């Protein structure tokens, strides 16, 4: 069963849901989607009954969590979501694995009164309940903290309009130590036995130590082969404390030598805004299908012939949210990339993006990813 919700869903996902007659909650967003692809729409009552028997549900957006909270409130899954969405509770639960990890939950009022000299900088400041990189700040110096507090105040009302409280809650924040190492994202699910099944692993590429953007992620044969077993052991160990089963998760971690430290576990979904589809363009894996049908990828077979290739998801975020998508020269992108597998134009006022591109890049041509990562994208905007 699937819950579709704003702000975006890919045609690739809709095509799968339509062709396989997957039960989809009948809400306003799903009705709009059904105009493009015939969908097996079911009522809230039917969805609840289905969940009681099948114990498996996938959401394409964190906006769908409101329905889960309202309709499955007595179910164990809501308790698990609350723990995973609340970053302070999450840190507390995993503290036996990371006894020396510094974190502190704090209100906005307390944030304005904090003694900077007492902070163990560098630290990360973010909403206790958050999504993507919205409201995430790296704090090195006092001026960074002051700028973050000002930005929080300036964006408070806008974030309330854009995201439900279940997605981003700006009433509480968490200060936590900066995690060293290379950042990776994992799309996986825990099966009915609590065993983790990894569907994709991609690294988060940054332009500088202070960069917190979501511009570039990529996956490759080397990444999968290097980290799949390690991350499976990590997910197995964390589940001794989390006790998850029959749930999809999008996990972000940092790896520093032998240390794997979680940034966050995002429940009920894979990579947001249908960016999980990078697994399909790289490896032919429809992640939603693998979760719903309890499938496990045979990476030994899948990765054959994928040597020396990088498969990227590139977010075309607006440098200025007032720029209309009509000014963006999408065709110009083809001059800068070796092989664009799919270009997704997104003209949605609630999203400050022009769209996404999925690319295949030869390892020796990684400079094209470095280029787009450092670009402010104004060069693609017509005057």
Model-derived regions: residue spans:
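Conserved metal-phosphate-binding beta-hairpin within the catalytic cores
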Residues: 239-276, 303-322
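Conserved ATP-binding module of the ATP-grasp superfamily
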Residues: 100, 142-180, 237, 241, ...
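Conserved N-proximal alpha/beta basic substrate-recognition cap immediately N-terminal to
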Residues: 29-119, 131, 361-374
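Glycine-rich phosphate-binding loop of ATP-grasp-fold ATP-dependent ligases
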Residues: 123-153, 183-185, 207-223
């Amino acid at each position: 069963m699937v819950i579709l919700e704003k702000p975006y869903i890919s045609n690739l996902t809709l095509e799968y849901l339509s062709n396989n007659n997957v039960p989809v909650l009948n809400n306003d967003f799903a009705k709009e989607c059904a105009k493009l692809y015939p969908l097996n729409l079911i009522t809230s009552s039917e969805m609840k009954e289905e969940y009681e028997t099948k114990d498996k549900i996938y959401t394409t957006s964190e906006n769908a969590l409101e329905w889960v909270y309202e309709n499955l409130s007595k179910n164990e899954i809501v308790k698990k979501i609350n723990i995973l969405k609340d970053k302070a509770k999450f840190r507390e639960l995993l503290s036996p694995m990371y006894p020396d990890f510094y974190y502190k939950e704090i209100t906005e009022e307390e944030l304005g009164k904090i003694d900077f000299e007492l902070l163990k900088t560098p630290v990360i400041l973010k909403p206790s309940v958050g999504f993507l990189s919205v409201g995430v700040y790296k704090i090195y110096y006092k001026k960074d903290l002051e700028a973050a507090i000002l930005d929080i105040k300036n964006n408070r009302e806008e974030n309330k309009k854009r995201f439900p409280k279940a997605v981003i809650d700006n009433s509480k924040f968490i200060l936590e130590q900066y995690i060293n190492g290379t950042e990776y994202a994992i799309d996986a699910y825990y099966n009915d036995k609590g065993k983790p099944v990894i569907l994709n692993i991609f690294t988060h590429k940054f332009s500088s130590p202070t960069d917190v953007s979501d511009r570039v992620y990529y996956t490759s044969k080397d990444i999968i082969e290097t980290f799949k077993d390690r991350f499976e052991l990590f997910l197995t160990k964390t589940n001794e404390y989390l006790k998850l089963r029959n749930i999809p998760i999008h996990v972000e971690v940092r790896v520093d030598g032998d240390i794997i430290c979680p940034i966050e576990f995002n429940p009920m979904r894979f990579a947001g805004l249908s960016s999980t589809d990078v697994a399909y363009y790289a490896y032919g894996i429809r992640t939603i299908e693998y979760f719903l049908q309890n499938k496990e990828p045979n990476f030994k077979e899948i990765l054959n012939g994928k040597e020396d290739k990088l498969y990227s998801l590139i977010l075309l975020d607006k440098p200025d949210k007032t720029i209309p998508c009509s000014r963006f020269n999408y065709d110009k992108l083809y001059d800068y990339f070796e092989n664009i597998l799919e270009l997704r134009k997104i003209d949605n006022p609630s999203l400050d993006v022009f769209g996404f591109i999925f690319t295949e890049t030869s390892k020796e041509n990684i400079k094209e990813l470095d280029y787009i990562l450092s670009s402010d994208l104004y060069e693609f905007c017509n005057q």
